[in-house]
């Protein structure tokens, strides 16, 4: 039985569901996620040390980031709308002996059920795959406790991002399957910061994520013209 979600693109869900069995293959289509994951984890930890924290990973997919945060000592819940990806995530966590609570639920639904329940919320490489990213940002803001942190990452919408993230990554270097990204769904940093402020979050840090095709390595930089990450914080309760 197929479940229909209001803020989900069926084509996007099908695309990632078809690849679900390859999530944990470091040489598969998900190789970039495996390679950037240590950078993402260190960046999150530099702002919000995870040990002992309750964390929800929104759009967790096969659980690459979720597992690494659990290994860092967090109590992690991973949510996604791809049932196949969640099965892979659950099986891998069992095999690895890493405790992660996975659930097929929309961010908006979890926010309605458990508002203000998490110290940290992560939503990485996900916003560019949904019809209404602002709705997801609002849900993340609702999920986090006052004084807690919400982390996002996505792709800038400009000519350089189109050339590198779509043409370069998908058609020239073949790092990603063709059709992985829809340029129209890319989000400018100013737009994402606006979504965050409207939702009651305070943008605190903006970093770029760059890939060097000569070295095959990724690095965090101050160039946010293609891939970028933004750290936000929910103000303390008055």
Curated annotation (Swiss-Prot):
Q: Which domain of life is it from?
A: Bacteria
The lineage, from the top, is: Bacteria, Pseudomonadati, Pseudomonadota, Betaproteobacteria, Burkholderiales
The entry marks the following residues as binding S-adenosyl-L-methionine, namely 40, 59, 80, 124
Pathway, per Swiss-Prot/TrEMBL? Answer: Cofactor biosynthesis; ubiquinone biosynthesis
Q: Name one Pfam family in it.
A: Methyltransf_23
Q: Which HAMAP family match?
A: UbiG
List the keywords (alphabetical): Methyltransferase, S-adenosyl-L-methionine, Transferase, Ubiquinone biosynthesis
GO annotation, biological process: methylation
Full protein name: Ubiquinone biosynthesis O-methyltransferase
Q: What does this protein do?
A: O-methyltransferase that catalyzes the 2 O-methylation steps in the ubiquinone biosynthetic pathway.
- A molecular function (GO) term: polyprenyldihydroxybenzoate methyltransferase activity
Q: Which organism is it from?
A: Ralstonia nicotianae (strain ATCC BAA-1114 / GMI1000) (Ralstonia solanacearum)
Instruction: Give the family per the record.
Output: Belongs to the methyltransferase superfamily. UbiG/COQ3 family.
Q: What Enzyme Commission number(s) does the record list for this chain?
A: 2.1.1.222, 2.1.1.64
Gene3D superfamilies per record: Vaccinia Virus protein VP39
Q: Which reaction does it catalyse?
A: a 3-demethylubiquinol + S-adenosyl-L-methionine = a ubiquinol + S-adenosyl-L-homocysteine + H(+); a 3-(all-trans-polyprenyl)benzene-1,2-diol + S-adenosyl-L-methionine = a 2-methoxy-6-(all-trans-polyprenyl)phenol + S-adenosyl-L-homocysteine + H(+)
Q: Which InterPro entries match?
A: SAM-dependent_MTases_sf, UbiG_MeTrfase
Q: What class of enzyme is it?
A: transferase
């Amino acid at each position: 039985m197929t479940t229909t979600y209001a803020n989900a693109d069926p084509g996007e869900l099908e695309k990632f569901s078809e690849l679900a069995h390859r999530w944990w293959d470091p040489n598969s289509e998900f190789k970039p996620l495996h390679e950037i994951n240590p950078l993402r984890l260190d960046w999150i930890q530099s702002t919000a040390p995870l040990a002992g924290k309750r964390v929800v990973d929104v759009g967790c997919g096969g659980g690459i980031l979720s597992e690494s945060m659990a290994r860092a000592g967090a109590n992690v819940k991973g949510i996604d709308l791809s049932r196949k990806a969640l099965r892979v995530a659950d099986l891998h966590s069992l095999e690895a002996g890493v405790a992660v609570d996975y659930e097929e639920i929309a961010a908006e639904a979890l926010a309605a059920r458990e508002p203000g329940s998490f110290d940290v919320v992560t939503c990485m490489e996900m916003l560019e795959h949904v019809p209404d990213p602002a709705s997801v940002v609002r849900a993340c803001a609702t999920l986090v406790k006052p004084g807690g942190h919400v982390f996002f990452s996505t792709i800038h919408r400009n000519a350089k991002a189109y050339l590198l993230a779509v043409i370069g990554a998908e058609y020239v270097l073949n790092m990603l399957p063709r059709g992985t990204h829809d340029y129209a769904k890319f989000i400018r940093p100013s737009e994402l910061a606006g979504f965050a402020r409207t939702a009651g979050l305070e943008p605190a840090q903006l970093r770029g994520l760059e890939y060097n095709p000569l070295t095959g390595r990724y690095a965090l930089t101050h160039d946010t013209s293609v891939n970028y990450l933004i750290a936000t914080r929910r103000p303390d309760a008055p």
